[in-house]
Amino acid sequence: MISFSEATRFTPEKYEETRVWCKEHGHPLPKYLLYPRTKGFVSTVQHLRQAEHVKAVYDICIAYQHRDIFMAAPDMLHTFILGKLTERHRYRFHAHVRRFELRDLPETDVELAKWLEQRWLEKGEWLAEQKERWSKGQKQS
């Protein structure tokens, strides 16, 4: 199961809405990301706790760049029709994956929502670090 907690595609307009919402509600603004919608994630995790075979939650963050434009993702059409996006078309991609044991996640809905918010802030920091590295021509970490 995959949960896209931003709930919509990132656009400059959506980021501005996120900035305003975070300011009005006293939440920190994640870098390069929309503020996560927590209800679906919280509900899913609470139900997955009941499944014996589910042991972990994976947090995946993908950084991408086209030529010199950070977080410029290829659209679906280009993904399917253009072969070798990285070599021929100068896209860069890097996925950062972390595993969190389900038993180690907070128990209450409120704390679980805060946990997700913290992951989002960490993702934003990681993306900022990737942008800095890539702008200097350094390898991913």
Where do the PLM segments sit?
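A cross-family acyltransferase "interaction/gating" segment
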Residues: I2-V110
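Pan-eukaryotic secretory-pathway lumenal catalytic ectodomains of glycan-active enzymes
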Residues: E87-S141
